[in-house]
Amino acid sequence: MAEQMVFDADQVTAEVAEGIEKIQNASNLEELKAIKTTYAGADSAMTKASKAIGSLPADQKKEAGKLMGKLRADFGRAYGPKEVELKEAAEKAALAAETVDMTLPVSRKPLGARHPLPKLMEDVEDFFISMGWQISSGPEIEAEWYNFDSLNFGPDHPARQMQDTFYVKGNQAKDAAGFVGSNMVVRTQTSSDQVRALLTRGVPLYIASPGRVFRTDELDATHTPVFHQCEALAVDKHLTMADLKGVLDKLAVAMFGPEAKTRLRPSYFPFTEPSAELDLWFPDKKGGPGWLEWGGCGMVNPNVLKSAGIDPDVYTGFAFGVGMERTLLLRSDINDMHDLVEGDVRFAEQFVMGE
């Protein structure tokens, strides 16, 4: 049973006041971000109170809304300047720790190194090209129809909510396929390229769509608001789950070595039916050999094929997607997403040029 939301003005006011006091006493950025998560994150009293406004009598909603607006503004006014202050302090400390003695002889210019993430994405592209597949790339600013409607997401699906998806101002953008989107979003998945490719390339179709996607996640050790996926789509006559499993097994071996193997667990995704979670086993897994979740997959939902004007009684298809950052973390000793996005040259130097 879902937890019943109760609006308690005194409680949320006290919680926000406590959060503001802790903001003022924060000594570093990590502590400050943790305070924001606790007092303004998805599980905070402030967020729960905002959601509970909908259950209030009509004559109380206006005052409750004003109160929540004021509390959020107070929290933001305390958080913003403190964040600037702590960032400046951190930068000064970093500069002080990295001072250079200008009287020392000049050292040899160090060799550069490629960032491991684009190198991994090229490896994945090479795998699909070796099988005769095409590489496809859709736009990052996408029509909501391609990102959700064409993939069988219902109008009330939680993924459409603004706390999960970035919506873009300005609409009615016409694309190459002639579709006019009523809303524009920053794509949340490279699956948005599926129906676009079916409309522009036709069938049979075998494509891989690697690229950046965007979610409203906070940057932490395991999440980032901008990350990379590779979506694979095959549509042809007589394709089955056996074909899907065969491609997944080959990809696992290409990425993790000859002993790697995959298994499928029943799951649910709007754009596939049946759907499965993709698990991976390989001997070099951190902590020893074992199974762990790698991605999602399944047979293309007939409604997705119909969105592209394809007869699901004639054609079938399979699709799967894996996260590139997750794949990289599994293949290396990297343990923190911050290392991938901060642009520290010392991180890239750990990876040999051309590997």
Curated annotation (Swiss-Prot):
Keywords (A to Z) from UniProt: Aminoacyl-tRNA synthetase, ATP-binding, Cytoplasm, Ligase, Magnesium, Metal-binding, Nucleotide-binding, Protein biosynthesis
UniProt-listed Enzyme Commission number(s): 6.1.1.20
Which Gene3D superfamilies does UniProt cross-reference here?
Answer: Bira Bifunctional Protein, Domain 2
Q: Is Oxidoreductase included in the keywords of this UniProt record? A: no
Q: Which residues bind Mg(2+)?
A: E273
Taken from the UniProt record, the cysteine pairs bridged by disulfide bonds within this chain are: none
- GO terms assigned for molecular function: ATP binding; magnesium ion binding; phenylalanine-tRNA ligase activity; tRNA binding
Q: Which reaction does it catalyse?
A: tRNA(Phe) + L-phenylalanine + ATP = L-phenylalanyl-tRNA(Phe) + AMP + diphosphate + H(+)
Under the subunit heading, UniProt states: Tetramer of two alpha and two beta subunits.
NCBIfam families attached here? pheS
Q: Which family does it belong to?
A: Belongs to the class-II aminoacyl-tRNA synthetase family. Phe-tRNA synthetase alpha subunit type 1 subfamily.
Please report the name of this protein according to its UniProt entry: Phenylalanine--tRNA ligase alpha subunit
- Protein source organism: Bifidobacterium longum (strain NCC 2705)
